[in-house]
């Protein structure tokens, strides 16, 4: 118990130390925004992984794997009629990749591979040439190569050991781009920059920084904040669009984000931003533990009787109440908020419950994000 509390206090201390920087931090535009015309595109394909050591799909349970093997062999000129395949060295997989903006034919991207059937491991396998298509149905890349699997699995007659995921992996630089996305970047007259974390203050500040640069370089304003996420930049007549974008993305802008508390109930992780404030509120936290114990007793019949052995149930219920400490929270600063929460001495799940209750009471002046 003491070790858990110490770890929890250390976690809060690290979070507090990380948030000692000013609320308004200076960042380059390339670090906080991206070009709307330069977004990523998703690719997907279906393929086969070969060379597995008996850890592939069982063809009876995965008929699509058998069909794919036969189709591949027929394309290679090998007849499979009249034969029954019993191999366990092949697995059917889905292959995904991200096509970066302005990618040219011949460049390479990483691909992710995931099993479709009942294969137990893809370790040591090789992805056979697989076409990757976009949402429009066009083929943009072809993937092939050895799969890297980080997890492992070992199994014996009476025990098994596994760590990580063995049915998914990656092929570094495994896809070659064959077709480039149509782009009108050079022919465009406007640029739209999109903030990764939408905020009106940051958008207005970004437009002001761009206009300050444009006034000195071109003698006029060229940027306008459209909303909390988008900033429109108009291309000057004599400017080169690529060089203009290179100059803009290196400008420094003051970024700002709203006060936010992020809670992950599955892992017990809590992240509290520096701008989070709590109005004065009293919090009492206590835990009720109920333990139910079953100790059945075997009852034997009397000698020479015709009775039968029976099991008599015996249930014991114990209830214990811990905690109940009342603390006054007045989070005028992150330091006082963390100190107030730690003074109660609760576990992470208790902190989550307290934050939710404070938000319901209207005392938490921040957005509460539950994951």
From Swiss-Prot:
Localization per Swiss-Prot or TrEMBL: Periplasm; Bacterial flagellum basal body
Main localization category: periplasm
GO cellular component: bacterial-type flagellum basal body, distal rod, P ring; outer membrane-bounded periplasmic space
A GO term for molecular function: structural molecule activity
Span of the signal peptide: 1-25
GO biological process, one term: bacterial-type flagellum-dependent cell motility
InterPro entries the UniProt entry points to: Flag_FlgI
Keyword field: Bacterial flagellum, Periplasm, Signal
The protein's assembly and partners: The basal body constitutes a major portion of the flagellar organelle and consists of four rings (L,P,S, and M) mounted on a central rod.
Function: Assembles around the rod to form the L-ring and probably protects the motor/basal body from shearing forces during rotation.
NCBIfam families: PRK05303.1
Similarity section: Belongs to the FlgI family.
Protein name in UniProt: Flagellar P-ring protein
């Amino acid at each position: 118990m003491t070790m858990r509390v110490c770890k929890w206090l250390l976690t809060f201390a690290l979070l507090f130390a990380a948030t000692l920087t000013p609320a308004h931090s200076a960042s380059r535009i390339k670090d906080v925004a991206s070009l709307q015309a330069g977004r990523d595109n998703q690719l997907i394909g279906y393929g086969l992984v070969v060379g597995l050591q008996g850890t592939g799909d069982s063809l009876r349970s995965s008929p699509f794997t058998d069909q794919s093997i036969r189709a591949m062999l027929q394309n290679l000129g090998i007849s499979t009629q009249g034969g029954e395949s019993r191999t366990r060295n092949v697995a059917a997989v889905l292959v995904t990749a991200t096509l970066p903006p302005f990618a040219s034919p011949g460049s390479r991207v990483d691909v992710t591979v995931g099993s479709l059937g009942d294969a137990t491991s893809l370790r040591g396998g090789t992805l056979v040439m697989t076409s990757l298509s976009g949402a429009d149905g066009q083929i943009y890349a072809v993937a092939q190569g050895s799969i890297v699997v980080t997890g492992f699995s070992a199994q014996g007659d009476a025990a098994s050991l596994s760590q990580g995921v063995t049915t998914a992996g990656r092929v570094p630089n495994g896809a070659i781009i064959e077709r480039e996305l149509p782009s009108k970047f050079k022919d465009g007259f406007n640029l739209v920059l999109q903030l990764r974390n939408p905020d009106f203050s940051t958008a207005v500040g970004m437009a002001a920084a761009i206009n300050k640069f444009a006034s000195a370089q071109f003698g006029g304003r060229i940027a306008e904040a459209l909303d909390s996420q988008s900033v429109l930049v108009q291309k000057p007549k004599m400017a080169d669009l690529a060089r203009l974008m290179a100059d803009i993305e290196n400008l420094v802008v003051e970024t700002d984000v709203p006060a936010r508390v992020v809670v992950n109930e599955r892992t017990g992780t809590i992240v509290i931003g520096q701008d989070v404030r709590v109005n004065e509120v009293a919090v009492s936290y206590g835990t009720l533990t109920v333990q139910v114990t079953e100790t059945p007793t075997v009852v034997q019949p009397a000698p020479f009787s015709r009775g039968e052995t029976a099991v008599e149930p015996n249930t014991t219920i114990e209830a214990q109440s811990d905690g109940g400490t009342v603390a006054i929270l007045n989070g005028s600063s992150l330091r006082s908020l963390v100190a107030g929460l730690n003074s109660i001495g609760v576990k992470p799940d208790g902190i989550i419950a307290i934050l939710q209750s404070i938000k319901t009471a209207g005392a938490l002046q921040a957005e509460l994000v539950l994951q």
